[in-house]
A protein has these predicted regions:
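Individual transmembrane alpha-helices with interfacial aromatic-anchor signatures
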Residues: 55, 123-142
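Short alpha-helical packing/oligomerization segments
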Residues: 82-107
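Juxtamembrane boundary at the C-terminal end of a transmembrane helix
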Residues: 147-154
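Core segments of transmembrane alpha-helices
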Residues: 58-73, 136-144
Length: 154
């Protein structure tokens, strides 16, 4: 099960990396708090329109991998072969980003992709999605590192 956990975590890291390629545009203007330049908003919004709406069924693959990751982690916990701290830490590192994506990041990305809001609100959404993705990337990176170190008995 550990190889499945690291594979799922690695896949999610790759997806986050792609998202961050677009999200990083908003980092150049993070201190202003105002509207992002229109070409930047258009780029980020177009990406999230494709990623959340027009890329189906591929966009559902990400949710499926999150579900597989959590199910595999639950199965691994029932086996009783891993230290409790590893399982609890892993549950937090995988569960928090999943819940954040479900409750905030994906709805914000969908709204941003629709471009129905004011430029100021779209800028806020772009910054929020970027912040969420940075947090999720850190969590998934730590998750993968934990399971790779465990597999290598480091």
């Amino acid at each position: 099960v550990a190889p499945l956990l690291t594979a799922c975590g690695g896949f999610l890291l790759a997806v986050l990396w792609m998202d961050l390629i677009f999200d990083s545009q908003s980092l150049r203007h993070r201190s202003s708090g105002g509207e992002l330049p229109e070409p930047m908003l258009a780029s980020v919004a177009a990406y999230y329109h494709r990623a959340t709406t027009t890329s189906r069924p591929m966009s559902r693959l990400i949710a499926l991998v999150m579900l597989i990751l959590l199910a595999a982690l639950g199965f691994q916990a029932t086996r009783g072969q891993d230290p409790g701290w590893l399982l609890v830490t892993s549950a937090g590192l995988a569960g928090f980003p999943t819940m954040l994506a479900l409750t905030q990041t994906v709805p914000d990305a969908i709204r941003l992709g629709r471009r129905d809001d004011s430029a100021l609100e779209q800028s806020r959404l772009a910054r929020s999605v970027c912040r969420d993705h940075l947090v999720c990337f850190g969590c998934m990176l730590a998750f993968v590192v934990l399971w790779v170190c465990d597999a290598l008995a480091i």
